[in-house]
Amino acid sequence: MLNQERTFTPSEAAVVSGVPVKTVHREIDEGPLKPKRRRPGSKRTLREQDLFYLAVAKGLDTRLVQLTSEGKDKLHDAIIVYWRSRKPAKKELPLFGGRLLLDLKLVLEEVRSRLERLERARAMVVEDPEIRGGEPCIRGTRIGVYEVASMLEHGAAEEEILEGYSSLKREQLELAKIFAQAYPRKGRPPRHPWHQTPWREISRSETLR
């Protein structure tokens, strides 16, 4: 069921739809996506059906299908109708006179699965002024979520991180990556005393407050 109230930033939309952030901005700038603004001067945001459109468009083979601006509008409109259906009756949807057949049910399931993982990532992270001065940490620990994501980005093996941070579970590593992609850290990352040492669980005496 379509959530008319829920909106997403371009970074959130990129994670859920599985496309680069620059693609999200291009589809906004060139159409057919029409962003909402929560308030004057705020960042532009997208609706759930827009994420579905991005995921569908990503799956089109550009060697076979080149959509014009009008074609993108028609595809977006068809996707909204399908998305609003409580129980979509068709697995595949014919478009443009039957010349294009899309497996929208599969894409819908993938988008909702990614959205669920994003929600789990959000729920996993806590920002408490009493814990490292409000640094986003993995719930139940004093481990910064951006630190874990950075380790993975720079090639650290999951086994190495799990050995050094025994309180973490493997799923939390994947969720940390998702969170960092959806909510990029602003500004220059802070320096921490354990950056020059192998990955390990930090003690309270080492923790920045």
What spans do the regions from the language model cover?
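Pre-recognition alpha-helix immediately N-terminal to the DNA-recognition helix
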Residues: 23, 52, 144-147
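Short helix-start
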Residues: 34-59
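DNA major-groove recognition helix of helix-turn-helix
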Residues: 27-29, 50, 152, 177
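Polyanion-binding surface elements
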Residues: 2-23
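Helix-turn-helix DNA-binding helix
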Residues: 24-25, 173
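Helix-turn-helix-like N-terminal two-helix hairpins of bacterial/phage DNA-binding regulators
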Residues: 7, 21, 30-36, 43
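Basic Lys/Arg-rich amphipathic helical interaction modules
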Residues: 1-5, 58-129, 133-139, 143, ...
